């Protein structure tokens, strides 16, 4: 499994990013989707982020995962929070004991030109 990046943000918050290079069959031996996804790229992204979550939180039962009204997944009765994101060959997962969010995006040259309008100095340093 090609981890691209992993970080312990603090004592309770953790994140991991995976560079997806495997076919769907690699993931389907360990995780399944509750709802079928026809688009192959999206299906692989959804499978990858769930396997990444399972590796980060091995005690979690993915069969207990449901979607909130806002589309955010959660696990029934568990005292921790998590967030998923995926984009163009990457899957990301963040976990904490309080609400947490993660979003990954591909940096396009035209967006980079206007990044100064919406990123703070530390965020700009991360993408430099």
Regions found by a protein language model. Name each.
Residues 1-128:
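Core catalytic alpha/beta fold that binds nucleotide/phospho-ligands
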């Amino acid at each position: 499994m090609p981890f691209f990046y992993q970080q312990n943000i603090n004592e309770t918050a953790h994140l991991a990013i995976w560079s997806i290079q495997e076919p769907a069959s690699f993931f389907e031996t360990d995780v399944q989707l509750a709802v079928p996804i026809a688009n192959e790229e999206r299906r692989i992204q959804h499978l990858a982020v769930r396997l990444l979550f399972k590796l980060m939180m091995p005690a979690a039962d993915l069969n207990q995962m449901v979607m909130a009204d806002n589309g955010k997944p959660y696990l029934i009765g568990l005292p921790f929070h998590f967030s998923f994101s995926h984009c163009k060959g990457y899957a990301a997962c963040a976990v904490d004991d309080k609400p947490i969010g993660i979003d990954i995006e591909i940096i396009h040259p035209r967006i980079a030109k206007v990044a100064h309008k919406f990123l703070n100095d530390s965020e700009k340093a991360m993408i430099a």
